[in-house]
């Protein structure tokens, strides 16, 4: 029997918490750049990417439908560097997240090498649950 680790896929589905919690395995895989996904409440999320060595102008964020894509292309150094040890990775990357319906990007900030992307779920009133008042008289005349 084969076991498939879906956790890398599920971590990138923002707003599908019940599905992710039901299917997520304990296995974790690494990707570049490292990132966190925070949930403040049922309607507010934040994606934080660690981007040491990148500048704001090296980054591009695009939302196409429900696909949020973050791309980074670091500037090339003016002169070639001879490394004795290179522990910081500054390579081009493209990272995509699938957002649930009605999720919107409410803002993005880049501070101290961390890119924060804030997300908000905006449910239209037609989808939001409606409370129905119960009257004391029967609805149909009998």
From Swiss-Prot:
Q: Which GO terms describe its biological process?
A: protein stabilization
Q: Where is the sHSP domain?
A: 26-137
- Read off the Pfam families from this record: HSP20 (PF00011)
Judging by the UniProt lineage, the source's domain of life is: Bacteria
The record ties this protein, via PROSITE patterns, to: SHSP
Alphabetized, the UniProt keywords read: Chaperone, Cytoplasm, Stress response
Q: Where in the cell is it found?
A: Cytoplasm
Q: Name one GO cellular component term.
A: cytoplasm
Function field: Associates with aggregated proteins, together with IbpA, to stabilize and protect them from irreversible denaturation and extensive proteolysis during heat shock and oxidative stress. Aggregated proteins bound to the IbpAB complex are more efficiently refolded and reactivated by the ATP-dependent chaperone systems ClpB and DnaK/DnaJ/GrpE. Its activity is ATP-independent.
PANTHER family for this protein: PTHR47062, SMALL HEAT SHOCK PROTEIN IBPB
Q: What is known of its domains?
A: The N- and C-terminal flexible termini are involved in oligomerization and in the binding of non-native substrate proteins, and are essential for chaperone activity.
Q: Which family does the entry's similarity section mention?
A: Belongs to the small heat shock protein (HSP20) family.
- State the oligomer form and interacting partners: Homodimer. Forms homomultimers of about 100-150 subunits at optimal growth temperatures. Conformation changes to oligomers at high temperatures or high ionic concentrations. The decrease in size of the multimers is accompanied by an increase in chaperone activity.
Task: Name the chain's protein.
Answer: Small heat shock protein IbpB
State the taxonomy lineage. Answer: Bacteria, Pseudomonadati, Pseudomonadota, Gammaproteobacteria, Enterobacterales
